[in-house]
Amino acid sequence: MVANVETMFYVREKPWHGLGVEVQEALNSADALKMAGLDWEVKQRNIQVCGGAKIENYKANVRSTDGRVLGVVSDRYQIVQNKDAFSFTDELIGGDVRYETAGSLQNGKKIWLLAKMPEREVVGDKVEPYLCFSNTHDGSGSIRVCMTPIRVVCNNTLNLALNSAKRQWATKHVGNIDEKMQEARMCLQLADAYMDELAVCADRLANTTITDEQLDKIGRASCRERV
């Protein structure tokens, strides 16, 4: 199994691949950006052939710190910087946001960050959901945000979190990114409200008592529906 991790940080529990910087407490966005090795920007550069002629309609996404080419994209591609991903998550969750993991995959082509959401109690069990933000800088994928119980520590767990999430939002890197991010905030805030309501309903059902006669009626009705 390949982790594809370039840089990352994690809180306490070491990932299976053993890579990354361990911290003892979940970090705020400013510290998480640095500890995850994500404190760099993506710059767009023109592309030229050997003779010096410019290739029209395409740009190269280049990492600011080392000049690494992350990918070739169309000139319609809108960059979402790593720091903007953290700002989005800070604003969405609000309060004292804390990050559990974050990092760079595939030599900077993909990044993720995982923030802890407020703990909930559902029928006596504590549930600790995360908000996962994933972004690609090589033009291969969309901006994706989801709610997940999965602790993301590598490319495989990121794919698992995104592919199994029941509540998520995604958009391509074109058009008005600011408007799309506002749409994401509204969508995910509704999903968060849904989780709160789900916890209330589950507790209500758990505390509802029914008689043997009522249970028998429910069973008979269920059998009739299957016939």
Predicted regions span which residues?
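Feature for intrinsically disordered/low-complexity regulatory segments and propeptides
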Residues: 1-88, 92
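Intrinsic disorder/low-complexity polar-acidic segments
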Residues: 83, 87-226
